């Protein structure tokens, strides 16, 4: 019903149904096309983020219900929130020495909710309150590696918001795609830090496992959602779409992205993902792909110019409500995101990280085999 209403409005306005999504994200269709073309060309490589984890568990493909499972290592871990926050603050110093005390302020002010409570759902959500110049993190922290990386994403959002405090409200409307850049870049910094300073092979492998989960969730799975939603809109133009047809569209999109890396599909994906039913956002899926691939691309730039990157990155975030995404990248990073080079650099960084996981997983498995076996 919502899609039919939207399509009728687009018909009257004589516009493509993707146009509002581009406007909301302040990004050009050419940039999104360049991103998606690069990602589609690398789907075979990206599937290794799923297959490599499946092989480590002794299977050739991943069961759908295991896509978000933690690393199957012998030790059980619970990371206290205080420890997780210390790691996140330490990572933040790479960008700004003020980040640790700023994040402490967020906690002291009661702006961060992480408790486990009866009936409280898992997950995390960020909201900036413009009228108060205050960030809010609403979440349930579970003590897992995945939960810690989720907190890093939330603190990345909060830092982005904090950098813009004091600017006029009309200059603080952050495009969704750039919100995801800020959050996902912070998660990447956390992955890098833990892998570099891991006290054991298990800890390093856990961080790599979570990073591959991060890649498959935010690139492959979001690719499924993007293609499915576009296909659904095209079908809805013709009339009412049956449940069977919707399920078939999802299966086709799943197969196109996951290929043979999973055993079956998630049949309820189109039902249980609230992003398909949001009335204020159009196509809230490709911004995650944008944010993730972009974060890896920016990480490559950071390693090439570590001395000047923090200042440039801060100015990039501060100005994210003042100009288009395309213009931001041109001004601060001298990058044309309508061309494939930047996106391909991010995807190559993902490929290298998958290779590192495969190497570490092989070494760990060899050590775990008894000598007399």
Residue ranges of predicted features:
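Glycine- and acidic
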Residues: 19-33, 66-77, 132-145, 161-174, ...
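C-terminal, non-catalytic "cap/extension" segments appended to globular domains
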Residues: 4-6, 12-17, 22-27, 55, ...
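Active-site recognition of the HExxH zinc-binding catalytic motif
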Residues: 9, 142-165, 180-188, 228, ...
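Contiguous, non-catalytic segments that form substrate-binding/exosite surfaces or channel walls
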Residues: 1-136
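Post-HExxH zinc-binding segment in Zn-dependent metallohydrolases
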Residues: 174-203, 210-213, 217, 291
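Short, glycine/acidic-rich hinge or "gate" loops at secondary-structure transitions
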Residues: 4-7, 50-65, 101-107, 167-174, ...
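Generic structural signal for well-ordered, non-transmembrane alpha-helical segments
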Residues: 33-47, 86, 181-184, 248-252, ...
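Inter-helical turn/loop segments and adjacent helix faces that build the functional surface
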Residues: 26-30, 52-53, 95-98, 162-170, ...
């Amino acid at each position: 019903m919502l899609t039919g209403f939207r399509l009728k409005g687009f018909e009257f306005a004589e516009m493509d149904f993707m146009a509002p999504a581009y406007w909301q994200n302040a990004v050009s269709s050419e940039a999104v096309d360049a991103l998606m073309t690069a990602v589609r060309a690398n789907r075979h490589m990206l599937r290794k983020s799923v297959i490599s984890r499946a092989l480590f568990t002794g299977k050739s493909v991943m069961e759908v219900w295991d896509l978000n499972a933690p690393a199957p290592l012998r030790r059980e871990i619970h990371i206290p929130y205080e420890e997780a926050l210390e790691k996140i603050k330490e990572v933040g110093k790479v960008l700004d020495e003020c980040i640790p005390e700023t994040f402490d302020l967020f906690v002291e002010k009661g702006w961060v909710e992480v408790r486990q409570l009866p009936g409280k759902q898992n997950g995390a959500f960020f909201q900036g309150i413009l009228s108060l110049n205050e960030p809010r993190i609403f979440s349930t922290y579970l003590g897992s590696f995945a939960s810690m990386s989720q907190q890093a994403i939330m603190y990345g959002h909060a830092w982005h918001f904090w950098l813009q405090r004091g600017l006029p409200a009309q200059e603080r409307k952050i495009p969704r795609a750039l919100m995801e850049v800020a959050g996902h870049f912070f998660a990447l910094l956390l992955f890098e830090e833990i892998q570099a300073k891991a006290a054991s092979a298990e800890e390093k492998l856990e961080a790599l496992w979570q990073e591959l989960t991060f890649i498959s969730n935010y690139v492959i799975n979001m690719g499924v959602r993007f293609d499915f939603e576009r296909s659904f809109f095209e079908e809805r133009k013709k009339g009412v779409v049956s449940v069977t047809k919707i399920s078939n569209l999802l299966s086709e999109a799943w197969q196109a992205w996951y290929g043979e890396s999973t055993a079956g599909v998630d049949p309820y994906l189109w039902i249980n993902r609230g992003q398909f039913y949001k009335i204020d956002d159009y196509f809230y899926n490709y911004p995650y792909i944008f944010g993730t691939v972009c974060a890896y691309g920016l990480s490559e730039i950071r390693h090439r110019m570590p001395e000047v990157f923090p200042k440039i990155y801060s100015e990039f975030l501060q100005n994210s409500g003042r100009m288009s995404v395309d213009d931001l990248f041109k001004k601060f990073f001298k990058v044309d995101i309508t061309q494939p080079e930047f996106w391909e650099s991010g995807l190559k960084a993902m490929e290298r990280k998958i290779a590192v996981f495969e190497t570490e997983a092989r070494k760990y498995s060899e050590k775990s085999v008894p000598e007399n076996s």
